[in-house]
Amino acid sequence: VVATLAWTWFMLSQTPDVEARLHAELDAVLGGRLPTLADVPRLVYARAIIDEVLRLYPPVPFLSREAGKDEEFQGQPIPKGSVIVVAPWLLHRHKKLWEQPDHFIPERFLPGGAGAPSKFAYVPFSIGPRICAGMAFGQTESILCLAILAQSFRLRLKPGTNVQPICRMTLRPGDALPMTAEPRTVVAAAPGAAVAAFAPAC
């Protein structure tokens, strides 16, 4: 979650249009109050941002599995005991699988968007029986943390900072990500007013 949020703040600092759309959703859904678990299904753009960050910067960029029996893949024998490497970093950026794979486009994960071309093309938490047990918790925590902070602040990358991915157990933006928190004005709902669900235009 920590690495995912770090990448999220970095990407938001580079894409003011995405940041503005996120703030519009937070103001519409929350109206100045703190988010709760019940708000998560309505924070659809916040979820799309997290999903897109996980596509570009999967927590574990390379996965390894051991073949439990002799197999064959496209004519290539895979003996039992072979170590098979799966690279989410490459899958998530493959131009045959994704449109504009190197661009940060959260809209692809909105309802009605292109989404993942297949369940095997988007595996930030692995897939199958070895999928990360904390996937749902991690996604929910990321959305709530993003909503809490982004509602009150804009984070700006320190000028001149060169951000390079490094992998130390998880993929992170270097050893440090110096940013400045700028307070923002929250559009609060009137007392007792109902806040309409945010419906992003695709």
Model regions: which residues?
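Conserved cytochrome P450 K-helix/beta-meander segment immediately N-terminal to the heme-binding cysteine loop
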Residues: 20, 40, 70, 86-114, ...
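Beta-strand segments within the central parallel beta-sheet cores of soluble alpha/beta enzyme folds
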Residues: 21-27, 65, 103
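Conserved cytochrome P450 K-helix E-x-x-R motif and the immediately C-terminal K′/meander segment
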Residues: 32-74
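Cytochrome P450 heme-thiolate "Cys pocket" and heme-binding signature region
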Residues: 34-41, 62, 74-76, 93, ...
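C-terminal domain-closing interface element
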Residues: 46-62, 174-202
